[in-house]
A protein has these predicted regions:
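Conserved donor NDP-sugar-binding/catalytic core segment of glycosyltransferases
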Residues: 25-72
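Active-site acidic Asp-centered loop
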Residues: 21-23, 119
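C-terminal, non-catalytic tails of nucleotide-sugar-dependent glycosyltransferases
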Residues: 57-58, 69-96, 106, 142, ...
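Glycine-rich, basic loop-to-helix element that forms the pyrophosphate-binding segment
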Residues: 1-13
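Short aromatic/hydrophobic "clamp" motif used to bind/position activated sugar donors
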Residues: 18
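Short glycine/serine/threonine-enriched helix-capping/active-site loop
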Residues: 49-52, 145-146, 153
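A short, conserved alpha-helix in the catalytic core of glycosyltransferases
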Residues: 32-37, 90-116, 121-151
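Short, high-confidence coil segments that cap the C-terminus of an alpha-helix
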Residues: 15, 44-46, 140
Length: 224
């Protein structure tokens, strides 16, 4: 239980900030932790800051989380080649998101305590999304920075969920809990994501509806 492990660790932490960090990541730039702290420590700074994570093949694994992608949540610019600026420079700009991954997440200890830490009912999946949404709903900012970079050997810590029926059932239950806690409509309408873009992929391409309007396959009926 990832949530339980981190909640347990909080009992023994005494700093002003907590860093959630998976044991399957490797640091890419020396000042990564300074950069995360920079985004949180200045006046008006974020309560949470996440990092830019890469796969070992030099494609992006995480550049912020968009809720609603794939029906629940997905990673911005996932699988994009490293080095580009992304959609509207969003892969190269410090910005706010609704959530960031818990694989590398810095949070103010006071905010962690205020919202009660991680929800242990989300044992593995979506605990980071749920946590960030509760922090956002409490009035705080969640930031992501491309200037803290790490390589993430995703799921090496625990393995995949797809082929194990027990893990698959747990994952499905956590998906439904995300809707139950935060509301399906809320999950599907991320305020940091253009509703004209696709919810099926993580590449910021146009939605089928917008493409249909541009190609004339879909028409809009105006009412007086």
């Amino acid at each position: 239980n990832f949530s339980g492990i981190n909640n347990f660790g909080r009992q023994y932490a005494s700093g002003d900030y907590l860093l959630l960090l998976n044991n399957d990541v490797e640091v890419r730039n020396a000042d990564w932790l300074t950069e995360l702290l920079r985004q949180c420590a200045h006046p008006g700074g974020a309560a949470i800051c996440g990092a830019e994570l890469f796969y070992p093949d030099e494609t992006l694994q995480h550049a912020g989380v968009v809720t609603g992608l794939g029906g629940y949540a997905g990673h911005s610019h996932k699988y994009r080649k490293a080095g580009g600026s992304g959609y509207m420079f969003r892969a190269a700009t410090v910005q706010d998101f609704s959530a960031v991954t818990g694989a590398c997440l810095l949070v103010k200890t006071s905010v962690w305590d205020e919202v009660g830490g991680l929800d242990e009912a989300f044992a593995v999946a979506f605990n980071d999304v749920d946590f960030c949404l509760r922090v956002r709903d409490a009035g705080y900012r969640i930031a992501w920075t491309p200037y803290a970079q790490l390589t993430h050997y995703e799921s090496k810590s625990r393995g995949g969920d797809e082929k194990d029926p027990v893990k698959a059932r747990r994952f499905a239950a956590e998906q439904q809990r995300l809707y139950a806690v935060h509301g399906k409509a809320n999950i599907l309408h991320d305020p940091y994501y253009n509703p004209n873009l696709t919810m099926d992929r993580e590449d910021f391409s146009e939605s089928n509806d917008l493409r249909g309007l541009k190609e004339g396959r879909i028409t809009v009926q105006w009412r007086k």
